[in-house]
Amino acid sequence: MIIGQFVKKGKMMDTNITSDDLAILTKWDTPTICNALEEIIPERRGYGFTTTHLFSLDPALPPVCGFARTATIQAAAPSPETTEQMVAKRAAYYEYVAATPAPTIVIIQDIDPQPGVGAFWGEVQTNIHKGLGVLGAVTNGSFRDVPDSARGFNLIGGKVGPSHAFVHLVDIDCQVTVFGLTAKTNDIIHADQHGAVLIPPAAVKQIPAVVDLISRREEIILEAAKSADFTVAKLKTTMGQIKDIH
C-alpha cells in the first residue's frame, strides 16, 4: 500500500515540459536563470530561491535542472517507527524518487532543531540516487564521505559532517522548505554551486530568449567596463544604448 501510494503521487504531473527543455536550461548557471525569471515574472523577484550559502560536493559540476522529489528527515534521535516500518518507507521513497517525470532533483529538509546532526547524504546515498537517475540534491542538512561520494552527482547542502547519527526519513512526497526555497513534488528546480531556484512551468520555454536578451545587454556594459578609456561618461552613454536592445 505505501509503495503504491507514493509512486502514484510521483506520477501525477501531466506536463508538456520535456527533458530536452530542462537540459537546455543547464547551459546557464543558476544566477542567470534567476535573472531571466526576474524579467519573465517580476513579481516573484524576492522569493523562490535559496537565500543561504550552501556547501557544494563538487563546485566544478555544471548546473542541473529537473523535477523535484521531496522528503523530510531527522537525525538527532532514533525513529519512533519499527525496523519494518522504516524499511518499507525507505523502499517507498526509492520508488517515488525513480518515478516519472524525469530527470529528478531531490530536495530534503532536515527538520531537527539543529539541522545536520546526522548526514543523509554520503557515499551510499549519492550512488543509489545517481543510479536511479537523480541529477543532484539540495538540503539544509549535512553530507559526508566527500571523496567517496558519486562523481557527477550535484549535491549542495547546509554543512559537511562526519556522522549519520540516527538519520531517518520522516515524510516523503511533501512540501519542504530549504533555506527559503519551498518546493513540492514535480516542481522544476535549477541548481548549481550558487544555490537553487524554482522555475514555473510557464517560464521554462521563455527563458532561452530572455537570457539571450540579457546577455546582449550585459555584453555592451562589460565591453565598455573593460576598455582602456572607460569613464563615468562612457558608462552613461553605454547605459543609454542598452534601452535600444530588444
Where does each model-flagged region fall?
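Acidic, glycine-rich flexible loop/linker segments
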Residues: 158-234
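Buried hydrophobic positions in well-ordered alpha/beta secondary-structure cores of metabolic enzymes
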Residues: 37, 129, 187-189
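Intrinsically disordered, low-complexity regions enriched in acidic/Ser/Thr/Pro/Gln residues
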Residues: 6-87, 91-100, 219-230, 236, ...
